[in-house]
């Protein structure tokens, strides 16, 4: 199986359940089993949705280990291993490989604003330290820097850099990336609301926040997209769209953690500086969950 096929489909950007000041390991394991039983195609622990900025290094590594062990190779695990410190990203990536992850999701360095040359050098250094397939996580809305398609094309020449999680919401870029780099460069969207358009333009899948609470709907939606049955996909998308909106009214993952707590998947615990959502937002999430027949 080629790398592109290995990582296509609907992947869940997993939340990290907490119990007070600790990771709720039991709820995390149960969430993973729930995802797989509902048909999700892959799991992504300790990314943005997993609150990686507020996890200690020990917690970060523990979450990867739990996910890999509980998944037991039933679906691919793409571990979040990014940092704005190249040495730290290398350490997290090497740990993910040792733990048994199937791939690494590496965010573009945030805050320190590297040039395109700096971005290339950062990913090149990480690639030399691991044999894991690396997926670039391009999210300029959070990291400030935006990796262009030329830099991605150059990085794709490195054997184990295999694709991008594109969280730009820039749909024409899907076509630009495909024509600049080629169809074997794996394109996964990180924006739930534009996933349908992303797939129409030639995407290979998604890394989704919404699928934390609606894995069955999201995986069925993605199956129709991959089968080029966009009429059926659109029907499911209509069920999910209010949820895609409501889960981002306040800073993610606060809304999806509330929604997950409504389903009994975890407690509504989130770490500062993020806070639990307002009552007004809770009403929006509840309404969207009802629209999707989740409650």
Protein language model regions, located:
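Alpha/beta enzyme core
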Residues: 29-43, 90-104, 123-131, 149-162
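Glycine-rich, proline-tolerant flexible connector loops at the mouths of alpha/beta enzymes
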Residues: 40-66, 81-87, 106-118
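Conserved, mostly hydrophobic/aromatic
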Residues: 22, 35, 67, 96, ...
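Catalytic alpha/beta core domains of metabolic enzymes, predominantly
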Residues: 128-129, 142-248
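Short, small-residue-biased leader/transition segments that mark boundaries at the very start
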Residues: 1-3
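C-terminal alpha-helical cap/extension of soluble enzyme domains
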Residues: 9-17, 34, 38-40, 49, ...
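Alpha-helix-loop-beta-strand connector modules within alpha/beta enzyme cores
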Residues: 54-79, 119-136, 180-181
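Hydrophobic faces of well-ordered beta-strands that scaffold small-molecule active sites
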Residues: 8-14, 42-45, 77-81, 104-106, ...
